[in-house]
C-alpha cells in the first residue's frame, strides 16, 4: 500500500506511535506517522465508515470502520492465528482488537511488502494458496460466516437509496444474485474479499500471504475467484494469467470448481455479484 498526503490528527498520531512502540517498533515522540492508501484510493477518506490505515516504525495500525462488530472481529483474528490457518495469513502483532482514542476498533500488524502495480502478479502461488486455504478446516466450532453476503447486501441497499438514479434494475439483479448465493453447493474457509491488494510478504523474495481477514469465514469458495473471473469475463484480464491461476488452483485440489471442464457454472453468480459490488463502490466514491 502506498502512502498518501494527509493531515493526521495529533491524537491519532500519538496513539499510532504508542502502539508501534509497544509492538516492536522504534517509535519516539516525533517518529513519522503515515496514512496508507487502500487499493485505488487517491486521497484521504475522513469518513469513519471506512477503515483507516497508519504506518509507523514498521508497524501498521488499522482503525476499523465505526460500528464494526467487536466479537466478530475477535473471532476472525482467532481463526487466522490458530495452527490450521496461520500459515496462510500475515499474522497480527496483537491477537485481539484494541480501541482507538475515538472508540473505534483497532488491529495491529507488521508492515509488509505488497504487490506493486508494475510487478507481475504471482498467479501460480495465488491459485495454490487459495486452494490450500479452501481445503483447510480450522479446529473449533466458533468459525464465523464469511462477510461476502453482508457486503453484497450493503451494495444493494446503497443502490436502492441512491437518489435521482433509475437503478431499480440493478437492485433487482442484486437481490436475485443474493438469493442464489445464500444456498451454496459447497462451503469452505475463504478470505471473503480477495483481490491482489490483499497479498503481502514479510521479505522481498519470500512467499506471499493473505492480508485483511475482515471478511474471512465459512462461505462458497468461488467467492475468492470472483474478482479475477469477472475481470477475465469482461476482457480486463487476459487469458494467460486467468488460465495460470485456474490451473494452479485445480492442481492443488481447490474445491470451488470442477477439476476439469468449464468452471463458469460455479463462478458466474459470484463474479456477477463482485461486479455489482464494484459498481456500487465506484458510485459511492
Segments and roles (model prediction):
Residues 40-61, 178-223, 235:
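Active-site acidic catalytic loop and adjacent metal/ATP-binding pocket
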Residues 113-168, 185-187, 218:
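A cross-family kinase active-site recognition segment
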Residues 84, 134-138, 233, 253:
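Protein kinase-like catalytic domain
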Residues 1-89, 202-208:
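Conserved NTP-binding catalytic cores of kinases and kinase-like/nucleotidyltransferase enzymes
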Residues 102-119, 153-161, 272-285:
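A glycine-centered beta->alpha junction motif in the catalytic cores
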Residues 222-255, 273-285:
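Active-site activation/catalytic loop segments of kinase-like enzymes and analogous catalytic loops
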Residues 257-271:
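All-alpha amphipathic helical-bundle segments outside canonical DNA-binding/catalytic cores
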Amino acid at each position: 500500500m502506498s502512502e498518501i498526503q494527509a493531515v493526521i490528527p495529533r491524537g491519532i498520531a500519538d496513539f499510532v506511535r504508542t502502539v508501534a512502540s509497544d509492538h516492536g517498533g522504534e517509535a519516539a515522540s516525533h517518529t513519522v506517522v503515515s496514512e496508507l492508501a487502500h487499493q485505488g484510493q487517491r486521497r484521504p477518506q475522513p469518513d469513519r465508515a471506512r477503515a483507516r490505515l497508519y504506518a509507523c516504525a514498521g508497524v501498521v495500525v488499522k482503525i476499523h470502520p465505526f460500528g464494526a462488530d467487536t466479537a466478530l472481529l475477535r473471532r476472525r483474528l482467532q481463526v487466522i492465528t490458530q495452527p490450521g490457518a496461520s500459515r496462510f495469513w500475515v499474522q497480527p502483532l496483537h491477537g485481539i482488537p484494541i480501541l482507538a482514542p475515538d472508540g473505534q476498533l483497532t488491529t495491529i500488524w507488521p508492515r509488509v511488502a505488497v504487490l506493486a502495480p508494475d510487478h507481475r502478479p504471482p498467479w501460480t502461488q495465488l491459485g495454490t494458496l487459495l486452494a490450500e486455504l479452501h481445503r483447510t478446516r480450522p479446529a473449533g466450532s466458533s468459525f464465523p460466516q464469511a462477510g461476502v453476503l453482508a457486503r453484497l447486501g450493503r451494495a444493494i441497499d446503497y443502490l436502492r437509496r441512491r437518489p435521482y438514479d433509475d437503478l431499480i434494475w440493478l437492485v433487482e439483479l442484486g437481490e436475485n444474485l443474493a438469493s442464489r448465493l445464500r444456498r451454496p453447493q459447497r462451503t469452505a474457509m475463504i478470505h471473503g474479499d480477495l483481490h491482489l491488494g490483499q497479498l503481502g510478504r514479510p521479505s522481498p523474495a519470500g512467499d506471499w500471504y493473505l492480508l485483511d481477514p475482515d471478511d474471512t469465514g465459512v462461505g462458497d469458495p468461488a467467492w475468492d475467484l470472483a474478482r479475477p473471473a469477472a475481470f477475465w469475463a469482461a476482457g480486463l484480464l487476459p487469458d494467460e494469467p486467468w488460465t495460470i491461476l485456474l490451473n494452479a488452483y485445480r492442481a492443488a485440489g481447490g474445491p470451488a470448481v470442477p477439476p476439469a471442464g468449464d468452471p463458469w457454472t460455479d463462478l458466474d453468480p459470484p463474479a456477477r455479484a463482485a461486479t455489482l459490488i464494484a459498481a456500487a463502490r465506484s458510485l459511492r466514491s
